A protein has these predicted regions:
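A detector for short metal-coordination/catalytic motifs
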Residues: 193-195, 218-318
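An acidic intrinsically disordered interaction segment
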Residues: 1-8, 216
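Short, charged surface segments at domain edges that flank catalytic/cofactor-binding sites
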Residues: 140-141, 152-217, 233-244
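Short helix-coil boundary/hinge micro-motifs
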Residues: 5-169
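Active-site catalytic microenvironments for nucleophilic, acid-base chemistry
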Residues: 37-40, 216, 252
Length: 318
């Protein structure tokens, strides 16, 4: 066993934790989540931002291991883990002073507004990139903090992010005004995870191609795509970030769809509003798409649902 590994095993078994309910599980669960990001190739450099995958892994591991009355919020351990000395927060440009004077983070939105990413001690980072030492540190946390529930730990379940977060219809309510504090933070984090994955996954399952115009443009130099993840029923009304409420559209057609200038029939062809006046000689006219079939994802269970496209038509009087 290397000296570095021994050092971090000692530090991981002596984490500073709030004593309530026998000790807060947040830091160990966050570390387990980070280990899985490494194992699954989702971290390839020593920069760990708050991502939808991290939030999802945290929530899933929490359900597997935690039996106390603590609430599963990521923002608290992500911020307070810096007290352990091996976790370092890096502020967005211009936010350095605000972060240095911050003593607590009340929500994931505030965390993302202040912190660009976290980094690990270089020695710890190197340990986590190696499967054997990664597994040894993982086992250390499980044995120390979750001895009675570690049999429920199933990291393979984390590969179902698309099914659990995006494909299945959302059942996440709008944050009620009366809900505050940690309970509100839980709902905000769930919404963050779904929303972030929606924006990432929808363009991907449409092969970064506009479903209506078939425009496809990507860049090998920059992370650029000319399609948006468009909600069919507005998120402000439905709070639905599932794939069945999404479609990939280029920006001009996204706007036209949101304004009801175009819609989708139950056979997945394009409808154009009969009450618009346009120059049909223009290469950008909407009428050219009338009756055209959509480009759809590779699997029918990823198609926009008939319920959602029907609600969109009804909204705009088709």
């Amino acid at each position: 066993m290397t000296q570095d590994l021994q050092q971090y095993i000692h530090r991981f078994t002596h984490l500073r934790r709030a004593p309530q309910f026998g000790g807060a599980p947040h830091k160990p669960v966050l570390l387990l989540s980070i280990f899985q990001l490494f194992s699954k190739g989702l971290v390839t450099q020593n920069r760990i931002p708050v991502t939808a995958e991290l939030v999802y892994f945290f929530k899933t591991i929490w359900k597997q291991l935690v039996t106390t009355q603590h609430l599963p919020v990521v923002n608290m351990p992500f911020f307070h883990l810096q007290s352990e000395g091996f976790w370092h927060l890096h502020a967005w440009y211009g936010k350095e002073s605000e972060l240095s004077h911050c003593r607590d983070i009340g929500s994931i939105n505030k965390l993302n507004a202040l912190v660009e990413y976290a980094s690990l001690d270089e020695a710890l980072y190197e340990l986590l990139t190696q499967p054997i030492t990664n597994a040894a540190l993982e086992r250390t946390l499980l044995d120390k903090y979750f001895a009675t529930t570690e049999a429920q730990y199933c990291p393979d379940a984390l590969t179902t992010v698309l099914d659990d977060i995006v494909i299945k219809p959302a059942n996440i309510p709008q944050v009620p005004i009366a809900v505050a504090g940690a309970e509100k933070a839980v709902v905000e984090e769930d919404n963050f995870a779904r929303g972030s994955l929606f924006k990432t996954v929808v363009p991907r399952i449409y092969d970064f191609t506009c479903s209506i115009s078939k425009l496809r443009l990507t860049s090998t130099v920059q992370n650029v795509s000319m399609v948006d993840a468009c909600h069919i029923v507005p998120f402000s009304e439905s709070h639905d970030d599932s794939i069945g409420n999404g479609i990939a559209l280029c920006p001009n057609l996204h706007r036209a769809f949101d304004k009801g200038l175009i819609a989708i029939s139950d056979d997945y062809t394009v409808l154009v509003n009969k009450h618009i006046a346009e120059d049909k000689s223009s290469a950008f006219n909407l009428s050219q798409f009338a009756g055209q079939p959509l480009k759809l994802p590779y699997s029918e269970n990823l198609f926009p649902t008939l319920e959602n496209i029907g609600a969109h038509r009804k909204r705009w009087g088709y």
